[in-house]
Amino acid sequence: FKYAWVMDNIKDERERGITIDLAFQKFDTPKFNYTLIDAPGHRDFIKNMITGASEADCAVLVLSAKPGETDTAIAPGGQAREHAFLLKTLGVGQIIVAVNKMDDSNFSEDAYKAAVEKGKGLIKSCGYKADEVPFIPVSGWMGDNLVKKSENMAWYSGKTLLEAFDDFVAPEKPTGKPLRLPIQDVYS
């Protein structure tokens, strides 16, 4: 969880192993300055995910290489399905799909390919061009392919997650249009 703990600062998040609230972290790459918005994936906190996604120019959708988890996530009512549709609906036009938990499948290329095949069907149904979306095998637990190439996945020759961020294209800002901003709560 060391990489998740960078963003999960609330005691409940660390104890339960899930993101509850939005967390923001700034970082730079050679091409862009980023503000990472870590949004919850759990269905109980979908309002927080929508708030974060409404501010995003691009996103990382996370699927699992662990057998059965991607099937559940992309099925009707599944969280990955809901998040993918919400991202597209909220105008997030560019995504990367991180195939996580590669360590749970012993870094199996077959597990990765199975998740990619299912993931491509999902994102295509949401309106994304599946052939333009990179799928990157990662292990959040071990740190594989997040920042540096994984020695455990010699079969993968693509970019790391961090390297893939610089393939995003900066969206044109609607500076000549009326102001729009997300509102999460109203207090009286």
Task: Give the ranges of each region predicted by the language model.
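Residue-level signature of catalytic and energy-coupling elements of molecular machines
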Residues: 17, 38, 49, 60, ...
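Structured core elements
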Residues: 19, 26, 35-36, 60-62, ...
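Short, glycine/acidic-enriched loop or turn micro-motifs at the edges of active sites
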Residues: 41, 103, 142
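Amphipathic alpha-helical transducer elements in NTP-driven molecular machines
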Residues: 4, 20-21, 39, 43-46, ...
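Conserved C-terminal guanine-recognition region of P-loop GTPase G domains, centered on the G4
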Residues: 52-53, 59-132
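Conserved catalytic-core segments of large NTP-driven translation/proteostasis enzymes
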Residues: 113, 120-188
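P-loop NTPase switch module centered on the Walker A-proximal segment
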Residues: 1-47, 56-69
